[in-house]
């Protein structure tokens, strides 16, 4: 795969910056694929990670639990009205897979097992598993797998950056909602 052979080697990060092996500085504008939104090398995070790894580095949540997961669960339930439980997974692709499974199982549980259509936004990258590629289809990344992905109902991203000149933002929002409603 020759197109993958000449990548820049990142050797460290500080705050919102990444540095390569030649000392060149890059703005980490996607928070290292949305996984490092607090910045690189923040002392309080490093210290917290060190403290936690001295107690427990990892434990499965399959028929087990652990103190940090329980603490976070209680905090999330406390700030999310109507939520009574949470489900943790270890990456975004798996989160998408589980979300799809939960949605399909919900409809089956209430007797509407024929409700299987999933609505998505165009170019909404969600990961690299087949389910995540299906709901987050980005042609540049996944076109070689398109025939293997399940179908979704795709909508254009309602981005006011491309606001038609003859519309107000409110009119544009209403038009985007109308497009969705008309598909169902």
What are these model-predicted stretches?
Residues 10-13, 113, 147:
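A generic fold-level signal
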Residues 6, 14-15, 25, 85, ...:
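A generic secondary-structure signal marking the coil-to-beta-strand transition
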Residues 25-113, 119, 126:
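Glycine-rich loop-to-alpha-helix module at the N-terminal edge of alpha/beta enzyme cores
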Residues 1-17, 31, 55, 64, ...:
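Active-site-adjacent loop/helix segments that line or gate small-molecule/cofactor pockets in enzymes
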Residues 8-12, 39, 43, 66, ...:
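Electropositive phosphate-/nucleotide-binding environments in soluble metabolic enzymes
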């Amino acid at each position: 795969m020759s197109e993958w052979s000449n990548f820049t080697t990142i050797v460290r990060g500080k705050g919102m910056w990444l540095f390569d092996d030649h000392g060149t500085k890059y703005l980490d504008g996607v928070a290292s694929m949305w996984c490092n939104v607090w910045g690189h090398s923040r002392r309080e995070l490093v210290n917290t990670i060190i403290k936690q790894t001295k107690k427990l580095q990892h434990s499965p949540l399959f028929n087990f639990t652990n103190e940090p997961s329980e603490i976070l669960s209680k905090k999330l339930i406390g700030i999310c009205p109507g939520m009574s439980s949470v489900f943790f997974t270890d990456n975004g692709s798996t989160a998408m897979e589980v979300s799809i499974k939960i949605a399909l199982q919900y409809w089956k549980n209430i007797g509407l097992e024929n409700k299987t259509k999933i609505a998505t936004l165009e170019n909404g990258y969600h990961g690299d598993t087949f389910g995540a590629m299906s709901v987050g289809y980005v042609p540049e990344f996944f076109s070689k797998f398109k025939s293997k992905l399940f179908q979704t109902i795709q909508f254009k991203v309602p981005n006011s950056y491309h606001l038609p000149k003859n519309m107000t933002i409110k009119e544009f929002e209403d038009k985007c909602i109308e497009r969705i409603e008309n598909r169902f």
